[in-house]
């Protein structure tokens, strides 16, 4: 019985994902569904876009270790849950 219990504990530990990796969206379109697994240490999803009236909005999405710095005429949104940068 102890052997069975020990085997179940070992299988459970091996099958569990003990680490957590953030996933963020990464496409340049307004509506996005391409998912990217962030690197270790990247704990932020971001979405940047600028307000160019003639050319429309240009989107940049991805993972980062900190929220990117905003440039003039640019909007930056940051979040920290999976696929939150929609």
Swiss-Prot record:
Q: Where in the cell is it found?
A: Secreted
Q: Name one GO cellular component term.
A: extracellular region
Source domain of life is Eukaryota
User: Where are the disulfide bridges?
Assistant: 24-45, 27-32, 38-63, 67-78, 79-84
Q: Where is the signal peptide?
A: 1-21
Its chief place of residence is secreted
User: Which Pfam family is an annotated match for this chain, by its short name?
Assistant: Toxin_cobra-type
Entries under CDD domains matching the protein: TFP_snake_toxin (cd00206)
**Gene Ontology terms, MF aspect:** acetylcholine receptor inhibitor activity; ion channel regulator activity; toxin activity
**What tissues has this protein been observed in?**
Expressed by the venom gland.
Q: Signal: is it a keyword of this entry?
A: yes
Per UniProt, the keywords (alphabetical) are: Acetylcholine receptor inhibiting toxin, Disulfide bond, Ion channel impairing toxin, Neurotoxin, Postsynaptic neurotoxin, Secreted, Signal, Toxin
Keyword Nucleotide-binding recorded: no
Biological role: Binds with low affinity to muscular (alpha-1-beta-1-delta-epsilon/CHRNA1-CHRNB1-CHRND-CHRNE) and very low affinity to neuronal (alpha-7/CHRNA7) nicotinic acetylcholine receptor (nAChR).
Which family is this sequence assigned to? Belongs to the three-finger toxin family. Ancestral subfamily. Orphan group II sub-subfamily.
Q: What is this protein called?
A: Probable weak neurotoxin NNAM1
Q: Which organism is it from?
A: Naja atra (Chinese cobra)
